[in-house]
Amino acid sequence: MTLKEYLKLNFENGEAYIRRDRISQIKEVDGIIFDCDGVLIDIRESYNKAISKSAAYILEKITGFPFPEDLFSNEIIHLFRATGGFNDDWDTVYGIVMFTLSKMPSEIRKHLTTFIEEAGFKNSPISRLRFIENCWKRIEANTLDARFFSELVKDLKDFIKILDSTGRRSVDENLLKIHEQDADFQHFHTLLKRFLNSKEIGRSVIATVFEELFCGARLFKEIYGINPRINMGPGLIENERLIVKPKHLDSLISILGRKNLGIASGSRRRSAEYILGELIKKFNPKSLVFAEDVEAAERLLKKPLKKPHPYSLLKAAEGFGKVRSIIYIGDSMEDAIMASRARDETRRVIFAGVYRYTIFEEEMLRIFLKYRCDIILPTVNELPSILEMLGRRKN
């Protein structure tokens, strides 16, 4: 698709693009569903830092060697998300940690295998990490030189290029394939995967460390009912800011003629509500789908339903009742893929990609254009103006 096939509009925040062959359907929109992170809320100083800090913390404890918090850069995080399989930031931490440990010298992996077996799997995640940290103190000091770190970053970027929209599963499959000639690696991989246990807060190393650093002590205890053990101060969530302006949500409600605004997000409900505050009341309560809702459905249906699976989008749309057409607004390739899959099931879905609050704005704009997204906006705040330009009027 060439740029000539788009209607281009200029706004203060940047350029907007509308596919000309979608305009008639956009005019019929009577429901709008939003992703949360990067769309309603600016997360650039929260989630991305939580990923790099969590990975560095876990790796330091599990190897006995300090890892710089800035080693896993915004570029690396962007590459993970660009695969379409890492909307869940816990999965990004998993990918970083598993790959890094797979690159460790064989002697370190051998020690680590023994330490994990000694630590077992019954104690709390932080207790298990500290046990392994203490195990390293019993042996010769572990050393990793600057060359290891520089090669690690390069090799990690190359590894991410072979990952796909299956996310964590593609991490496991590709690591096992890369090390298929190593007789000990499969046992190491299985043991490590069980040790990290990437799902449940209070049992999972990754989830527990991440949420403590992200939420901070007070919010972590309030949400999960677990006493914090590694972060006794404020969390990175305090760095978040609202992108969406209340007046623009009001404009959309007026244009639609009813409160047909929903959320389909991989965020945790309580952390999203913490930042959205009273704005959450502007959304249809029947059309709010967060990570906990998807996880509950996965347990019930016994199959993976996280993005880019269209479950959360279609579930949120159900809350609107009968609609002619809906717009889903996201900021990642995973969102675009999810909307495309939802459109395969129902032709009513239009995708709008927003790029202003992504890590690399120009790169995300280029990707959205290459993917032939229906609408491309700098931010969600331009949408009311676009709908009005196309003939929609406030009620």
Residue ranges and their predicted role:
Residues 3-75, 91-94:
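Active-site neighborhood of HAD-like aspartate-dependent phosphohydrolases
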Residues 7, 228-250, 260-262, 266-327, ...:
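Substrate-recognition "cap/lid" segment bordering the active-site pocket of phosphatases
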Residues 23, 59-64, 103-105, 252-254, ...:
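Alpha-helix termini
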Residues 39, 46, 269, 334, ...:
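Conserved Rossmann-like nucleotide-cofactor binding loop
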Residues 51, 131-137, 141-199, 207, ...:
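Substrate-recognition element of Asp-dependent hydrolases with the DxDx(T/V) motif
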Residues 51-190:
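Conserved phosphoryl-transfer catalytic core
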Residues 84-85, 281-297, 363-387:
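Structural recognition of alpha->loop->beta junctions
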Residues 274, 328-376:
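Acidic, Mg2+-coordinating phosphoryl-transfer loop and its flanking beta/alpha structural elements
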